[in-house]
Amino acid sequence: MVAKINRLSRLTPLLFVFAPFLAQSNMTVYPMAVSINSQGEGNVRVISKSNEVQYIKATVFRIDNPSTPQENEVEIKSGDANHLVVMPPKFALPAGSSKTVRFVAMEPEQKEKNYRVKFEAVPSIDDVATDKKDLSMQLTVNLIWGIVVSVPPQQPIAKLEVNAAQKLVNAGNQRLKILTIAYCKNNSKENCKIQTVNKNIFPGQERNLESISGYDKIVVKYNNWITKDNGEFELAVH
């Protein structure tokens, strides 16, 4: 019998649980979300909470259509230089120790990419288990830690537009977190209705606006995860 926790929220760090009998966590991973830096690198620390040596395997999944009902994960072949590479992809974790694992984006990206890297304990470094190890794995919970890794574009562009269908569009090449949308009359910031959003919009994605009848413009306040600052766009609506 194997039980699995369903996805709790989209593009967030996840902890998957396969729990035949006993519930215990034999490792932790920190941090649970990583942004690749300008050198194309990032890292996490895998920390043992076990009294025994563990063998850890990392698997990379590309996240397609993030934060939409069509979101899905596509497994990336280990060592594929066109995607995120984990170093090392497999390793031994001695009791009570920790291990730094590096993420490397091998090629510059034209548009933001997001990955989920899953860390799990396996019976051996070669995934070949003995009967004794098989039994041990069956009698303890197998926790899979899902780390979100964001790779920025080489030349980030933050851009929002209102399209002909009167929808807000991310016309840039990186995600933005929409904080609020102000619907304003008479081209003034003083006569506005404020909508709180606090949701990401990814490159190419659209977002429905509230009724814009009677309004002249919207003021969209956002957070930029790459520069780590806030900004705003004033966009005419007709």
Residue positions per predicted region:
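N-terminal signal peptide c-region/cleavage motif recognized by signal peptidases
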Residues: 18-22
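Intrinsically disordered, low-complexity regulatory regions in eukaryotic proteins
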Residues: 26-94, 98-238
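Bacterial N-terminal signal peptides that target proteins for export
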Residues: 2-13
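Short hydrophobic/aromatic-rich motifs at helix boundaries and adjacent loops
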Residues: 15-16, 72
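Absolute protein N-terminus
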Residues: 1, 24-27
